[in-house]
């Protein structure tokens, strides 16, 4: 698959995300790997529902620097961290869905555990609803370097698959392709909504 096709698919996914209302008020950021050294990352302050390929900046994975001098998204360091930690990751999606944002505040533990839902099989490697999906929840931090360091430390100690939540902030997920990252996003968002509804009903 060519870089141009991957980027075109990412633009289409960004428009889909925008139509869903999952990146309101220009929030969120999305990227696709170019090669081992560079990725293409959405520019800061752009409406994700109206992006074109010109709205993506080439970013060096090792330094999180954009050679063009244009301003990449605030969470650039999280995208480059994922590409560094997971050589098989080729696309990263960071969104601000209401379910992810609220659920990340309800969960007081460092990890969210989800089980019993058939839709868990939308996540690569999950084959049954009987398994438990673990989604790490990290405290939000405006210091992206410090946040990236905590996530990297977690990944050294524990398995980190599919994505993670930032408390009061949103969801970051990834995949081996744009298509897989999109499936992980849609699957996790559905699971988060189910978890939210289940918790609400259990309180009645």
Swiss-Prot record:
Cofactor: binding details: Binds 1 zinc ion per subunit.
Gene Ontology molecular function, alphabetical: methylthioribulose 1-phosphate dehydratase activity; zinc ion binding
SUPFAM superfamilies tied to this protein: AraD/HMP-PK domain-like
Assigned keywords, A-Z: Amino-acid biosynthesis, Lyase, Metal-binding, Methionine biosynthesis, Zinc
Any one Pfam family match given in the protein's UniProt record, by short name: Aldolase_II
Residues that, per the record, bind Zn(2+): 94, 96
GO CC annotation terms, alphabetical: cytoplasm
Catalytic EC class: lyase
InterPro entries registered for this protein in UniProt: Aldolase_II/adducin_N (IPR001303), Aldolase_II/adducin_N_sf (IPR036409), MethylthioRu-1-P_deHdtase_MtnB (IPR017714)
Cofactors (names): Zn(2+)
Catalytic reactions on record: 5-(methylsulfanyl)-D-ribulose 1-phosphate = 5-methylsulfanyl-2,3-dioxopentyl phosphate + H2O
GO BP term, pick one: L-methionine salvage from methylthioadenosine
Pathway: Amino-acid biosynthesis; L-methionine biosynthesis via salvage pathway; L-methionine from S-methyl-5-thio-alpha-D-ribose 1-phosphate: step 2/6
EC number: 4.2.1.109
Protein's UniProt keywords contain Zinc: yes
Matching HAMAP family: Salvage_MtnB
Family: Belongs to the aldolase class II family. MtnB subfamily.
Function according to Swiss-Prot or TrEMBL: Catalyzes the dehydration of methylthioribulose-1-phosphate (MTRu-1-P) into 2,3-diketo-5-methylthiopentyl-1-phosphate (DK-MTP-1-P).
NCBIfam families linked to this entry: PRK09220.1, salvage_mtnB
Protein name: Methylthioribulose-1-phosphate dehydratase
Organism: Citrobacter koseri (strain ATCC BAA-895 / CDC 4225-83 / SGSC4696)
The gene coding this protein: mtnB
């Amino acid at each position: 698959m060519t870089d141009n096709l991957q980027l075109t698919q990412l633009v289409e996914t960004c428009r889909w995300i925008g139509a869903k209302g999952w990146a309101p008020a220009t929030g969120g950021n999305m990227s696709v790997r170019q090669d081992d050294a560079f990725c293409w990352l959405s520019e800061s302050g752009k409406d994700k529902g109206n992006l074109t390929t010109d709205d993506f900046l080439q970013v060096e994975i090792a330094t999180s620097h954009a050679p063009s001098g244009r301003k990449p998204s605030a969470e650039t360091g999280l995208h480059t961290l994922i590409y560094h930690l997971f050589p098989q990751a080729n696309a990263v999606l960071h969104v601000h869905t209401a379910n992810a944002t609220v659920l990340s505040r309800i969960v007081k533990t460092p990890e969210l555990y989800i089980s019993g839902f058939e839709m868990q099989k939308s996540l690569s490697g999950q084959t049954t609803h009987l398994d438990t999906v673990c989604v790490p929840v990290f405290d939000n931090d405006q210091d992206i370097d410090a946040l990236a360091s905590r996530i990297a430390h977690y990944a050294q100690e524990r398995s980190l698959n599919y994505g993670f939540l930032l408390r009061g902030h949103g969801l970051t997920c990834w995949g081996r392709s744009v298509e897989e990252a999109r499936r992980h996003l849609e699957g996790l968002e559905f699971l988060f909504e189910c978890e939210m509804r289940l918790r609400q009903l259990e309180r009645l």
